[in-house]
């Protein structure tokens, strides 16, 4: 096939170029060689041209997790309801199903993922399918399959079809030997959870695909994300979500981390906006493939003190989970996100007082509605 022959010639010339000894050779931004997976000779996909001037066609994997539904809502407001496809392996609740396109997508099924991208003319892919820190430690084999094998499928499909790919990373990508206060973008990582290891793997594989295949890979290391309208998903920072629900409902909360455990945190609206902003940033503005982003850092005790300003009778007790505490003790206390602020203008809106007020107002309103019903 002439196209395959031409691509092999391009790859041969690229790989045969001499290196300078201290820096990798300058590579073209887009496709450099053959696809990471060979296309079967009998493959039969419908191909449709897509203009870069049009709105992106978006696919979100793992869309029923903490961030997917909110991201879909934000992107649909920006790009149109029908241009954003939410996907997961679970059955969506009715309000999600009715809010816009939803399809079944198993990231471990490479052929199915590829068909979805081609048949829906996808140009942007947000890859949110993952098992989080505490859940991953309880099921390492499943975490390895979802977080690593699934990532490989997504990377290959994205490279083959020239997608712009976003993969979130995490504070969990760092370990006990990393600088903790603050933690810069580039430093020793060496995490000690399968979740963290898989995220470092994702960061490095994405950067490799950027240089090797020209994949437009973009990644943010999220701090702990606090959201009002979703349930905790098995992460070490879940206490900072659960505390508001329990404070409004019961007036007390049992925390599974030590009172002095400081971790970086962010309200979900800031998180989703940062994700959209880095995806919309001009390619030439990005000096890194993976950026830290941050808003605030606090301890459980500091968060409880802020809650007490609104609910004076609130009580917090501590029953430390040794597994989660060990994970938290290996993570950054504060993120240095100065590069993101410099390169693409990142700026957070929510500090701790605004966060607490927003969360308590949300849960207070829902509690009053429930009582009325």
Curated annotation (Swiss-Prot):
The active site is at 195 (proton donor/acceptor). It catalyses: L-threonine + NAD(+) = (2S)-2-amino-3-oxobutanoate + NADH + H(+). Its EC number is 1.1.1.103. This is L-threonine 3-dehydrogenase, mitochondrial. GO terms for molecular function: identical protein binding; L-threonine 3-dehydrogenase activity. InterPro entries: Epimerase_deHydtase, NAD(P)-bd_dom_sf, NAD(P)_epim/dehydratase. It comes from Sus scrofa. Catalyzes the NAD(+)-dependent oxidation of L-threonine to 2-amino-3-ketobutyrate, mediating L-threonine catabolism. NAD(+) binds at residues 62-67, 88-90, 106-107, 195, 199, 225. One of its GO terms (cellular component) is mitochondrion. The gene is TDH. GO terms for biological process: L-threonine catabolic process to glycine; threonine catabolic process. It is found in: Mitochondrion.
């Amino acid at each position: 096939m002439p196209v395959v022959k031409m691509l092999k010639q391009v790859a041969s010339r690229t790989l045969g170029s001499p290196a300078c000894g201290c820096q990798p050779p300058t590579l073209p931004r887009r496709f450099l060689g053959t696809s990471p997976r060979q296309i079967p000779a009998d493959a039969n996909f419908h191909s449709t041209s897509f203009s870069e001037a049009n709105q992106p066609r978006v696919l979100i994997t793992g869309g029923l997790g903490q961030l997917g539904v909110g991201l879909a809502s934000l992107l649909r407001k920006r790009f149109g309801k029908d241009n954003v496809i939410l996907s997961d392996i679970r059955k969506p609740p009715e309000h999600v199903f009715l809010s816009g396109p939803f399809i079944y997508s198993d990231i471990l099924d490479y052929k199915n993922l590829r068909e979805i991208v081609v048949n829906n003319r996808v140009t942007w892919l947000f890859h949110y399918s993952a098992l989080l820190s505490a859940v991953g430690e309880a099921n390492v084999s499943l975490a390895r399959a979802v977080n690593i094998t699934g990532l490989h499928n997504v990377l290959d499909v994205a490279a083959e079809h020239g997608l712009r790919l976003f993969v979130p990373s995490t504070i969990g990508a760092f370990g006990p030997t990393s600088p903790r206060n603050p933690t810069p973008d580039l430093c020793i990582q060496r995490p000690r959870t399968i979740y963290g290891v898989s995220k470092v793997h994702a960061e490095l594989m994405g950067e490799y695909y950027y240089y090797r295949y020209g994949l437009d890979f973009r990644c943010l290391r999220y701090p702990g994300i606090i959201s009002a309208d979703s349930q905790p998903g098995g992460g070490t920072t879940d206490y900072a979500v659960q505390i508001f629900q329990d404070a409004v409902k019961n007036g007390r909360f049992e925390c599974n981390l030590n009172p002095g455990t400081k971790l970086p945190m962010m309200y979900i609206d800031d998180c989703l906006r940062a994700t959209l902003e880095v995806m919309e940033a001009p390619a030439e503005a990005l000096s890194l493939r993976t950026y830290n982003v941050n808003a605030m850092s606090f301890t459980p005790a500091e968060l409880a003190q802020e809650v007490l300003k609104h609910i004076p009778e609130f009580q917090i007790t501590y029953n430390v989970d040794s597994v989660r505490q060990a994970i938290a003790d290996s993570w950054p206390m504060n993120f240095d996100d100065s590069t993101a602020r410099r390169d693409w203008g990142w700026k957070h809106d929510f500090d701790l007082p605004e966060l607490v007020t927003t969360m308590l107002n949300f849960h207070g309103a829902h509690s009053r509605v429930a009582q009325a019903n």
